[in-house]
Protein backbone atom coordinates (compact mmCIF):
# COMPACT_ATOMS: atom_id res chain seq x y z
CA UNK A 1 0.00 0.00 0.00
CA UNK A 2 1.24 3.46 -0.82
CA UNK A 3 1.53 6.07 1.94
CA UNK A 4 -1.16 8.72 1.56
CA UNK A 5 1.51 11.42 1.74
CA UNK A 6 3.68 9.97 -1.03
CA UNK A 7 4.06 11.72 -4.37
CA UNK A 8 2.22 8.97 -6.24
CA UNK A 9 -0.98 9.51 -4.26
CA UNK A 10 -0.72 13.29 -4.66
CA UNK A 11 -0.72 12.93 -8.44
CA UNK A 12 -3.96 13.90 -10.16
CA UNK A 13 -3.37 10.98 -12.52
CA UNK A 14 -3.41 8.29 -9.79
CA UNK A 15 -6.35 7.27 -7.63
CA UNK A 16 -6.12 4.80 -4.77
CA UNK A 17 -9.56 3.49 -3.87
CA UNK A 18 -10.18 1.50 -0.72
CA UNK A 19 -13.61 -0.11 -0.93
CA UNK A 20 -15.45 -3.39 -1.29
CA UNK A 21 -14.41 -4.46 -4.80
CA UNK A 22 -17.84 -6.02 -5.39
CA UNK A 23 -19.41 -2.55 -5.04
CA UNK A 24 -18.52 -1.23 -8.48
CA UNK A 25 -20.50 1.98 -7.85
CA UNK A 26 -17.62 3.11 -5.62
CA UNK A 27 -15.10 3.15 -8.47
CA UNK A 28 -16.86 2.73 -11.83
CA UNK A 29 -16.80 6.40 -12.88
CA UNK A 30 -13.08 6.65 -12.00
CA UNK A 31 -12.29 3.96 -14.58
CA UNK A 32 -13.56 6.11 -17.44
CA UNK A 33 -10.60 7.34 -19.52
CA UNK A 34 -8.29 5.21 -17.39
CA UNK A 35 -5.06 3.98 -19.00
CA UNK A 36 -4.20 1.41 -16.33
CA UNK A 37 -6.29 -0.16 -13.57
CA UNK A 38 -4.60 -2.25 -10.89
CA UNK A 39 -6.49 -4.74 -8.74
CA UNK A 40 -4.77 -5.30 -5.40
CA UNK A 41 -7.97 -6.03 -3.47
CA UNK A 42 -7.80 -9.32 -1.63
CA UNK A 43 -8.69 -11.36 1.38
CA UNK A 44 -5.21 -12.69 2.02
CA UNK A 45 -4.89 -14.43 5.38
CA UNK A 46 -4.70 -18.13 4.48
CA UNK A 47 -5.70 -19.37 7.95
CA UNK A 48 -8.88 -17.26 7.81
CA UNK A 49 -9.78 -18.83 4.47
CA UNK A 50 -10.55 -22.08 6.31
CA UNK A 51 -12.89 -20.25 8.69
CA UNK A 52 -14.80 -18.18 6.13
CA UNK A 53 -14.01 -19.49 2.64
CA UNK A 54 -17.02 -17.80 1.03
CA UNK A 55 -15.63 -14.37 1.97
CA UNK A 56 -12.45 -15.27 0.09
CA UNK A 57 -14.39 -16.44 -2.96
CA UNK A 58 -16.51 -13.28 -2.85
CA UNK A 59 -13.58 -10.86 -2.68
CA UNK A 60 -10.83 -12.69 -4.55
CA UNK A 61 -12.83 -14.40 -7.30
CA UNK A 62 -16.14 -12.57 -7.70
CA UNK A 63 -14.55 -9.23 -6.79
CA UNK A 64 -11.86 -9.65 -9.43
CA UNK A 65 -14.58 -10.62 -11.91
CA UNK A 66 -16.69 -7.54 -11.08
CA UNK A 67 -13.61 -5.31 -11.38
CA UNK A 68 -12.71 -6.86 -14.72
CA UNK A 69 -16.23 -6.41 -16.12
CA UNK A 70 -16.22 -2.78 -15.02
CA UNK A 71 -12.82 -2.22 -16.65
CA UNK A 72 -14.10 -3.70 -19.91
CA UNK A 73 -17.30 -1.63 -19.73
CA UNK A 74 -15.26 1.55 -19.17
CA UNK A 75 -12.74 0.60 -21.88
CA UNK A 76 -9.70 0.60 -19.61
CA UNK A 77 -6.64 0.11 -21.82
CA UNK A 78 -4.49 -2.02 -19.49
CA UNK A 79 -5.31 -4.08 -16.41
CA UNK A 80 -2.88 -5.40 -13.82
CA UNK A 81 -4.17 -8.07 -11.46
CA UNK A 82 -2.14 -9.01 -8.40
CA UNK A 83 -2.54 -12.69 -7.63
CA UNK A 84 -0.44 -14.90 -5.36
CA UNK A 85 2.33 -17.46 -5.56
CA UNK A 86 0.03 -19.60 -3.38
CA UNK A 87 -1.74 -20.72 -6.59
CA UNK A 88 1.21 -23.07 -7.21
CA UNK A 89 0.35 -25.05 -4.08
CA UNK A 90 2.76 -26.65 -1.65
CA UNK A 91 6.23 -26.92 -3.13
CA UNK A 92 8.92 -28.28 -0.85
CA UNK A 93 11.93 -27.92 -3.14
CA UNK A 94 12.78 -26.30 -6.42
CA UNK A 95 11.43 -23.28 -8.19
CA UNK A 96 7.96 -22.39 -9.42
CA UNK A 97 7.63 -21.18 -13.00
CA UNK A 98 4.80 -19.01 -14.24
CA UNK A 99 3.91 -21.45 -17.03
CA UNK A 100 3.45 -24.43 -14.71
CA UNK A 101 -0.01 -25.65 -13.79
CA UNK A 102 -1.60 -24.19 -10.70
CA UNK A 103 -2.36 -26.52 -7.81
CA UNK A 104 -4.25 -24.56 -5.13
CA UNK A 105 -4.23 -26.35 -1.77
CA UNK A 106 -6.42 -24.10 0.39
CA UNK A 107 -9.50 -21.88 -0.02
CA UNK A 108 -7.36 -18.73 -0.37
CA UNK A 109 -5.21 -20.09 -3.19
CA UNK A 110 -8.27 -21.60 -4.89
CA UNK A 111 -10.01 -18.21 -4.86
CA UNK A 112 -6.94 -16.54 -6.41
CA UNK A 113 -6.56 -19.31 -9.03
CA UNK A 114 -10.25 -19.02 -9.93
CA UNK A 115 -9.79 -15.29 -10.49
CA UNK A 116 -6.83 -15.97 -12.77
CA UNK A 117 -8.87 -18.39 -14.88
CA UNK A 118 -11.65 -15.81 -15.30
CA UNK A 119 -9.18 -13.05 -16.10
CA UNK A 120 -7.36 -15.14 -18.70
CA UNK A 121 -10.65 -15.99 -20.40
CA UNK A 122 -11.48 -12.29 -20.74
CA UNK A 123 -7.96 -11.49 -21.88
CA UNK A 124 -8.43 -13.69 -24.93
CA UNK A 125 -12.14 -13.10 -25.49
CA UNK A 126 -11.85 -9.31 -25.47
CA UNK A 127 -8.24 -9.05 -26.70
CA UNK A 128 -7.39 -6.96 -23.62
CA UNK A 129 -3.92 -6.15 -22.36
CA UNK A 130 -4.09 -7.83 -18.97
CA UNK A 131 -1.13 -8.80 -16.84
CA UNK A 132 -1.30 -11.12 -13.84
CA UNK A 133 1.53 -11.02 -11.32
CA UNK A 134 1.90 -13.66 -8.65
CA UNK A 135 3.34 -11.80 -5.72
CA UNK A 136 4.80 -13.64 -2.81
CA UNK A 137 4.78 -12.47 0.79
CA UNK A 138 4.78 -8.73 1.22
CA UNK A 139 5.98 -7.24 4.49
CA UNK A 140 6.04 -3.63 5.54
CA UNK A 141 4.20 -0.80 7.17
CA UNK A 142 0.50 -1.57 7.68
CA UNK A 143 1.22 -5.31 7.78
CA UNK A 144 -1.76 -7.13 9.24
CA UNK A 145 -0.90 -8.34 12.74
CA UNK A 146 -2.02 -11.92 12.04
CA UNK A 147 0.58 -12.40 9.28
CA UNK A 148 3.59 -14.66 9.81
CA UNK A 149 6.33 -12.14 10.59
CA UNK A 150 4.21 -10.11 13.02
CA UNK A 151 2.85 -13.24 14.71
CA UNK A 152 6.30 -14.81 14.96
CA UNK A 153 7.85 -11.71 16.54
CA UNK A 154 5.05 -11.42 19.12
CA UNK A 155 5.22 -15.15 19.90
CA UNK A 156 9.00 -15.08 20.32
CA UNK A 157 8.74 -12.11 22.70
CA UNK A 158 6.15 -14.03 24.74
CA UNK A 159 8.19 -17.28 24.65
CA UNK A 160 5.46 -18.98 22.63
CA UNK A 161 6.08 -21.27 19.65
CA UNK A 162 6.06 -19.72 16.20
CA UNK A 163 3.56 -21.08 13.66
CA UNK A 164 4.92 -23.71 11.30
CA UNK A 165 2.79 -24.88 8.39
CA UNK A 166 3.20 -28.25 6.73
CA UNK A 167 6.38 -30.07 7.69
CA UNK A 168 8.33 -26.85 8.21
CA UNK A 169 10.61 -27.38 5.21
CA UNK A 170 8.95 -24.84 2.91
CA UNK A 171 10.94 -21.76 1.94
CA UNK A 172 9.15 -18.44 1.60
CA UNK A 173 10.48 -15.22 0.13
CA UNK A 174 9.46 -11.78 1.33
CA UNK A 175 9.35 -8.39 -0.36
Regions found by a protein language model. Name each.
Residues 1-138:
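N-terminal Rossmann-like NAD(P)+-binding domain of SDR-like oxidoreductases, especially those catalyzing
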Residues 29, 48-51, 143-147, 175:
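Generic recognition of short, well-ordered alpha-helical segments
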Residues 93-94, 117-174:
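NAD(P)-dependent short-chain dehydrogenase/reductase
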Amino acid sequence: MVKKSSSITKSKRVRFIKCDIINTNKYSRLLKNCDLAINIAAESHVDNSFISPLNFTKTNSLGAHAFLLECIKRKVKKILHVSSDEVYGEKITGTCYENQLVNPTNPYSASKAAAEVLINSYKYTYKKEIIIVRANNIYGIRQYPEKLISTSIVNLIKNKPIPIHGNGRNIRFYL
